[in-house]
Amino acid sequence: MSPLSSLPPKTFISSFHCHSVTRLRRSVTARTMSSQSSQRVFQLRQDPLTGNSEWIVIEDNDQPGTSTDGLLATTSYLDMLNDSRRNIAYRLAIEKTITEPCHVLDIGAGTGLLSMMAVRAMRGDSKGMVTACESYLPMVKLMRKVMHKNGMTKNINLINKRSDELKVGSEDIASRADVLVSEILDSELLGEGLIPSLQHAHDMLLVDNPKTVPYRATTYCQLVESTFLCNLQDLRNNEAKTSDGVRLVPPGLESLFGIKSQQYSMHVDAIEKEIKLLSEPVKIFEFDFWKRPESNGELDVHIEAKTTGSVHAIISWWVLQLDSEGTIFYSTAPRWIDSNSEIGVRDWCDHWKQCVWFTPGTGVSISKGEKVHLHASHTCTNILYNLKKTQSLTHERTHFPLSTGDLHLTLPPERVAIYGDSIYRQSLFEATRKALQGKSYPQCLVIDDSLLLPLMALHISNRSRVLSLSPGLQENAARYFEAIADSNGFSKDRFEYFRDGKTNLAKAYPGKIDLLIGEPYYSGLENGLPWQNLRFWKDRTLLDSVLSEDAVVMPYKGVLRGCAMYLPDLWKSRCCLGSVEGFDHTLVNTTLGGCGDLPSGKDSPCLPFFIWQCGETKILSKEFTVMEFDFSKPITGPCSGEVQIEFIKPGVCHGIALWMDWVMDEENSTVISTGPDDKYWKQGVKLLGKPVTVRMEGPSSSIGIQASLDLSSNSELIVTHTIS
């Protein structure tokens, strides 16, 4: 694991500044306590239905109740180990690099695949040794089992520490290592702490001029035009086209609101038809693993446009050279690049994607043959861009001067696009207007992190008063609404951010709330499963006492919907493992959440994905309703539902896509769907244990879906299926 990492390994979350980031689906914090006999980790886990956090205990030994299955089942380890192209490249490079007994260091060892490859390359010679460090205790426990299964326990010294905690000459590592093997890479390349890890290793853990696998990484970028990508950040211009009269980004206050200036991982192959290439690929940075890297770097390059257009985004990727001779490569480039290269096109995988850097506003207009100036820089964890038409050089990142102190409210790109979508806004506006009808002096309570609904309620009724809980955005939301009040034509005394919690709210406003509303949207749950936004119902239940007799709750109900899908790429990336480059990995399947040949009684979890980014996909059935949740009433107990799938197309069914439809009013006149037809929402995916062949004629398998959800205890949706 990289030295700066305080999080478990292999996450899917975006990069943060100042520390390394790993690849779990949700960010967690872990604290370690150890003794001579065992080790114990306290890991912070958040309940998405309440926002509350609790410490859970992970024991070094496998005592009942301390299973790590749930902690690793949502990680990308399985996807990575199913990436055969990556596995083969590492095997070939390790066999080519390690030709005699030596001391090998594996940083961020995971299941131990690279360590075992190194042992095999030394042919089990007792003069050779492998030191493997892995900081996350659940993964350490799993690696021990894999090592034992493959007879490698005596050949690998596994240490449950970060690499920067190792000291040469101690019981951890007797001497400096001759060879470094590692895979501390994310989609951006640097986000898992590659640079600080290499710096510490070269300073403290490796011999001079060591051998390394990989040998070098090179980043590339390409200028593109894409209306879809532009919509993910340009709220100001999209909002100007709407007719609701509400302005999230009023003129002159653009600095208040936007996305973070960072790289965003994305499968750009899925939108290839929506992308216009404006330049040839450009080489940006080289990082040599075999020597100590610098913490920061800069590059200025002039890029010639090969066609006329507007630069809406910069797409980036990297290429690994795994051996020193330059014969073994691995690339994360888009298919339109690799299809024309010697490296070739890799199979779809989710653990490494391309990255997108957004150009602010409407982009940079360029003409064919014109050159634009790109300033690229990197920190220890990020690669940054600044694109200009002028030839004047600047080493500053693009930003708007803040006009209201340091306030800058940041939202994910998909949320920015949703707020700029005229259809979504019109639906929300009409639903809010309808909910306010007949109420003279309405007291409105917005219980989620919506930015649109408070403004719409204030705009539609000039006698309304709005309370907002903003549980995720908190004080920043309050400051934001205060800053845009004048531009939206309401006095600040009509809006209140209630900061004293739901319990005190119930005491302060008993029976006084006429309208309880939400989109629902909770900051921090964007990468979660769709039904986790049923936190709205949980909060509504807790606040039942504040509602007046004729209070309106919006949305009126939530509907869990689904459809059967052909998902060959996703299923292949999450299927159970057998032999990985000659090493038995069958025992990791349950722990890592595999689908396929799991033991009886075990099942793979529901995972959140943008369906449109999941490689080849096809909808095979009619959409169906699994469960309905009536928000007009408090939660009274567990919910359940079952449905028989009605197929409309032949094919192979790999899984079920699940999402929420929000019915905004009792008459069902306004329904906001988060299904796979829209690219701005993630869906939940439940992969089948075995793919099912569907025929339209003759005998064919039938699939029944059963689901249950107990919101009084947790947000885990239990989905099972029967095949007949």
Curated annotation (Swiss-Prot):
Q: What is its EC number?
A: 2.1.1.-
What is the protein's given name?
A: Protein arginine N-methyltransferase 1.6
Q: Which residues form the SAM-dependent MTase PRMT-type domain?
A: 61-388, 395-721
Lineage, highest ranks first: Eukaryota, Viridiplantae, Streptophyta, Embryophyta, Tracheophyta
PROSITE patterns, alphabetized: SAM_MT_PRMT
- Positions annotated as active site in the UniProt record: 183, 192
Functional summary from the UniProt entry: Arginine methyltransferase that can both catalyze the formation of omega-N monomethylarginine (MMA) and symmetrical dimethylarginine (sDMA).
Homology family? Belongs to the class I-like SAM-binding methyltransferase superfamily. Protein arginine N-methyltransferase family. PRMT7 subfamily.
- Enzyme class, broadest EC rank: transferase
Supply the Pfam families for this chain.
PRMT_C
Which PANTHER family does the entry mention? PROTEIN ARGININE N-METHYLTRANSFERASE, PROTEIN ARGININE N-METHYLTRANSFERASE 7
Q: Which UniProt keywords apply?
A: Methyltransferase, Repeat, S-adenosyl-L-methionine, Transferase
Domain of life, per UniProt, equals Eukaryota
InterPro entries per record: Arg_MeTrfase (IPR025799), MeTrfase_PRMT7 (IPR014644), PRMT_dom (IPR055135), SAM-dependent_MTases_sf (IPR029063)
Q: Which gene encodes it?
A: PRMT16
Which biological process annotations from GO are given for this protein?
A: methylation
Specify whether S-adenosyl-L-methionine is a keyword of the entry: yes
One Gene Ontology MF term:
protein-arginine N-methyltransferase activity
